[in-house]
Amino acid sequence: MQFPEIPPLDDALRPVLQAAIDDKTKPLGALGRLEALALQLGLIQGTARPVLRRPTVIVFAADHGVADAGVSAYPAEVTAQMVQNFLAGGAAINVFSRQHGIALEIVDAGVRVPLPAAPGLVNCRIADGTRNFANEPAMTPEQAAAAMTAGMARVLRHAQQGCNVIGFGEMGIANTSAAACLMQRLTGLPLEDCIGRGTGLDDAGLARKREVLAGALARHADAQAPLDVLATFGGFEIAMMAGAFLAAAASRMVILVDGFIATAALLVAQRLDPNVLQYCVFTHCSHERGHRALLAQFDAAPLLALDLRLGEGTGCALAWPLLASAAAFLNEMATFSGAGVSTASP
């Protein structure tokens, strides 16, 4: 499978951008991490006057066969029910997107029950959910490739419409199990560091989840390469996000990274092209146990720590105002020379 080439950021611009930030009418470093964020935006866009256009969140929804193994506190039909809630405008991501003027797109990547056509729903179905990876690979290599291609296509469509800042959310019962297996196999960390309670498993449910995932990892010990791991354990929504990350970076878009599931999809993308990380803004550290360890793999410093464990792209929407503020101060704050303000004494 061919992936778009991701250009590395131009480090020669770093001192130029840092000088522009330091010349603003404030003590050096006084805006803290907002300054690092502004620097990253400038590097991605190659300018000291970055402009963020048409912020968008794409929510990919799909079902997982491993849900049949009892690894989630909720039944699989909740995936389709939540998609209907998204379309009705009643979910958290709908509320936060409306609040902040973020465009929202809902993609059926492979919900178990086919959904009727509806305004706002994009049909990219690969199949009626994945197979149960406790027994067999979740998808074929061809299905994984088709899902990644579909994710790339959605991003390119938005890029062509002028969007240059994008985030990805997901909905899929049992997708924390898929993410945990992806994380364990691609990082080599102990399964215990990758697994959490998901949507609220009790102790018995967590023990069941641990047993199922350990068995699946042992059964599929031969799956080692990133695309093989994705096809074996992933979900259609995760594969679409992995492709979407690659396409967004290749299009030099600012990428908002949500929670555990999205970061697991990014892990696949990063194993395929490490340059993807340069375009990523990590929006938050979630309550899901594996997320903190996965962020550490990327040496990432997330913007928010709100104990979120919802997914949907909610972290992207909540962090968006910080990006807007970073771009605004870089564009609009006066400089010491322009405002006639004295700099600090040597």
UniProtKB/Swiss-Prot annotation:
SUPFAM superfamilies: Nicotinate mononucleotide:5,6-dimethylbenzimidazole phosphoribosyltransferase (CobT) (SSF52733)
Pfam families reported for this sequence: DBI_PRT
Keyword Protein biosynthesis found: no
Active site (catalytic residues): E312
Enzyme Commission identifier(s): 2.4.2.21
GO molecular function terms attached to this record: nicotinate-nucleotide-dimethylbenzimidazole phosphoribosyltransferase activity
Broad enzyme group: transferase
Reaction catalysis annotation: 5,6-dimethylbenzimidazole + nicotinate beta-D-ribonucleotide = alpha-ribazole 5'-phosphate + nicotinate + H(+)
Keywords: Cobalamin biosynthesis, Glycosyltransferase, Transferase
One GO-annotated biological process of the protein: cobalamin biosynthetic process
Cited NCBIfam families: cobT_DBIPRT, PRK00105.1
Its job: Catalyzes the synthesis of alpha-ribazole-5'-phosphate from nicotinate mononucleotide (NAMN) and 5,6-dimethylbenzimidazole (DMB).
Family that this chain belongs to: Belongs to the CobT family.
Protein name: Nicotinate-nucleotide--dimethylbenzimidazole phosphoribosyltransferase
Naturally occurring in which organism (per UniProt): Cupriavidus taiwanensis (strain DSM 17343 / BCRC 17206 / CCUG 44338 / CIP 107171 / LMG 19424 / R1)
